[in-house]
Amino acid sequence: MFVISTRNFPPELGGMQSLMGGLAESLLNYGPVKVFADKKSDQDNACDEKSSLDIERISGIKLFRKYRKSGVVNEFVKEQNNIRALILDHWKSLEHLDKNIISKTKVICLIHSKEINFPINSSQNKRIIKSMSKADCVVSNSNFTKQLAINLGIEKKKIKIIFPGINKPKKIEDKFDLESKNIFQNSFPKIITVARLEKRKGHEKILMSIKNLKARYPNIKYVSIGSGNEKNNLTKLCRELGLDKEVSFLENIDNSLKIALIKNSNLFLMPTIIDNKSVEGFGISYVEAASYGVSSIGGKDGGASDAISHEKTGLICDGNDLNSIYSSIEKIIQNEKYKEFGKEAEKFSKKFYWNKVVQEYINLIKSL
């Protein structure tokens, strides 16, 4: 049996939620999976009933929920003798577990970057180091995150890089394909971002780039899919730049429509930056776009270079430099470079399929 304790899990949306959901589902091919997850909405039960996973939701006020959940996990691990591995999504999921109890099994904790990015010797950093001391292995989502972890005091010998997985591409239903084409109309280039509306994702510079590109490409269209605390600022900037026609902000759309929009775009654009402690540890959206034959432009800050093969499946630019973003877009759009990059991106994405990524976890568990 595999046991997963996670703060992030479907049906809640997000990169970590997709990661933990995909990992749990993929591990089912190798044995039973027990999931302890936070209860965050009324949709949780309906989603869990459709799943083949054994999911136990822990409810209550967030402050107290983590202690209740740790107690439940401690008791479960104590009573079971057939647990092959205990996998945690976050150092906080490990923090309050009893080291004496969980030492009976193999403990793996995942790290993603921004949740560990606190100054060395700060109170948060000390909590992280203490929590990680309970883990047999720390799985990093990228080379960038691994180096960050080492710099912040996590034992190098404990860290193993396993990139996040993606599902194999799905066939797009005709109605969603048609709807996406109605959104894009006869535009060119068709540019898309799928990300939360946060400063580190680079939306502000994207809008400025679209404004500058408009003179050369009057039929340009940019679609942003996602919600977040920067929404009001970005919609205001969009109006100020006179881009109401060229830009569409979408949120809470059907996943099939999201996929159709990605598939029918020419370029996936997310020139990430470091915003205070917040940084993109990997960038699974680049790989998801690649799986549908769409090339990407990502930022040099963070782990995008593991998700994009520079000059082959896309480009890495300086997300803080408007000229760097603009010239990267031009380079891909000119001479239809996006088609060549897109074909390579689709091939590149196959190494991230869950059936291959989960095998890395199985091999890791066997090696511990």
Language model feature labels by segment:
Residues T6-L13, L19-Y67:
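N-terminal strand-loop element at the rim of the active site
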Residues L88-L94, I111:
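Short His-centered aromatic/hydrophobic patch
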Residues V139, I183-K201, L207-I210:
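Conserved donor-binding/catalytic core segment of Leloir-type glycosyltransferases
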Residues F144, G165:
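Carbohydrate-associated surface elements
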Residues P189, N219, K337-K351, N363:
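A short, well-ordered alpha-helix in the C-terminal region of glycosyltransferases
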Residues I225, T235-S256:
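Nucleotide-activated donor-binding/catalytic signature segment of Leloir-type glycosyltransferases, i.e.
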Residues K263-S278, V294:
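Acidic donor-binding loop of glycosyltransferase active sites
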Residues S309-E311, L315-L322, K331-E336:
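Conserved acidic donor-binding segment of nucleotide-sugar-dependent glycosyltransferases
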